[in-house]
């Protein structure tokens, strides 16, 4: 652990020395609405592009148009890194359309990364591994991402790989190719920092069972180890936590436990979710109302939902009110979940549905969250009124 810390601090020292005089610009994080699944584009101040996950068979329908038409990206200039969080269909099947000359034509320039999955299937080969081997793809075949990898995003901004394939930076490793690891728990966890701004993106990573928040799951608790690693390395502050948290696994009860939330203390949460999800009931009330915020009489998110005027803080009653991390200031989701209820929970509709969600920050004064209102219509879900595009600004508050 001590050796690992020294190595990381040496890397960070060199990194800051090199980039201290870089030109200032915004960091952007785009949650592309692919429905039930995930695809997130990170654009650094220096223009470095990381595409994290590629959605289902939606590359040509959702991702490619977003990249070309909304962002005006030129395929021949490419995307620097393609990172697959884990090998589930709703995270990888769009890759083929993104890189194929027929649809996207985007070149991957520096690396195609995956967590080190042991999963093998014809579908995985067809939609991910084989397309990456095309002679037009400069980065070449997918390969396991190195734990602790640091990607320079420019002007002091960086992305660090804190977890991959069930292993966490600074923690004892799992056995290589351990097939007992749930594929979700192989998810790559990226920590992104730009001056005052901090953000965690971690696919479908699990937080394990927890009585306090009524989480029932077969997934392991990897998220709490990630949070502890960030604290141990001094990458986040124990009192202030992170600004924005990716609510992993589409808001499933497998992830985002109270123990994890208590350590990362986010201000804003974002859920990538959508219709046509079967009986998963994402996002779940036991995550939204037991961890992120409190239950409300109208079923909608209210910033003061946990105030005394609204009935007090009803989350995680195994902790005293004074010990609990503050509830979220805002909760966004890319689309509506499918309504339903089972013996283990039901769907939450508290999150503000925004379609594509764009985070922008200069790293110093504030960060903003913008939404397009672009939702996906399906007969299998509930749709409310049309959503206009909009934007909200958040000031950095290191004493919250």
Please give the residue ranges for each predicted region.
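Active-site metal-binding motif and surrounding structural segment of the metallo-beta-lactamase
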Residues: 45-50, 57-110, 231-252, 265-270
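N-terminal cofactor/phosphate-binding cores enriched in small/glycine residues
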Residues: 39
């Amino acid at each position: 652990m001590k050796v690992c810390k020294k190595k990381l601090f040496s890397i960070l020292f060199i990194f800051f020395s090199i980039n201290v005089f870089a030109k200032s610009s915004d960091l952007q994080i785009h949650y592309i609405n692919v429905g039930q699944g995930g695809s997130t584009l990170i654009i650094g101040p220096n223009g470095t592009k990381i595409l994290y996950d590629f959605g289902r068979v939606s590359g040509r329908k959702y991702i490619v148009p977003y990249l070309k038409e909304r962002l005006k990206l030129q395929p021949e200039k490419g995307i620097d890194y393609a990172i697959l969080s884990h090998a589930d269909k709703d995270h990888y099947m769009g890759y083929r359309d993104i890189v194929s000359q027929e649809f996207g034509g985007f070149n991957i320039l520096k690396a195609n990364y995956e967590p080190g999955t042991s999963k093998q299937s014809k579908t995985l080969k067809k939609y991910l591994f084989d397309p990456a081997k095309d002679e037009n793809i400069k980065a070449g075949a997918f390969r396991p991402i190195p734990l602790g990898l640091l990607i320079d995003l420019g002007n002091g901004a960086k992305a660090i790989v804190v977890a991959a394939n069930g292993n966490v930076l600074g923690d004892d490793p799992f056995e290589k190719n351990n097939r007992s690891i749930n594929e979700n728990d192989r998810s790559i966890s990226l920590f992104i920092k730009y001056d005052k701004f901090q953000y965690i993106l971690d696919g479908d990573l699990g937080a394990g069972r927890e009585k306090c928040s009524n989480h029932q799951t077969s997934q392991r608790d990897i998220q709490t180890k990630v949070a502890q690693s960030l604290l141990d390395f001094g990458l986040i502050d124990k009192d202030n936590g992170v600004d924005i948290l990716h609510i992993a696994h589409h808001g499933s009860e497998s992830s985002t436990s109270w123990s994890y939330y208590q350590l990362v203390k986010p201000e804003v949460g974002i859920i990538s979710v959508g219709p046509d999800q079967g009986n998963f009931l994402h996002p779940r009330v036991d995550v939204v109302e037991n961890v992120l915020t409190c239950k409300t009489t109208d079923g909608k998110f209210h910033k003061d939902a946990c105030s005394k005027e609204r009935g007090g803080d009803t989350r995680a009653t195994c902790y005293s009110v004074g010990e609990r991390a503050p509830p979220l200031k805002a909760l966004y989701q890319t689309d509506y979940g499918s309504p339903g209820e089972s013996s283990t929970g039901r769907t939450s509709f508290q999150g503000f549905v925004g379609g594509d969600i764009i985070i922008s920050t200069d790293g110093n004064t504030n960060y903003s969250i913008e939404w397009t209102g672009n939702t996906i219509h399906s007969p299998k879900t509930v749709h409310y009124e049309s959503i206009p595009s909009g934007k909200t600004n958040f000031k950095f508050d290191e004493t919250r």
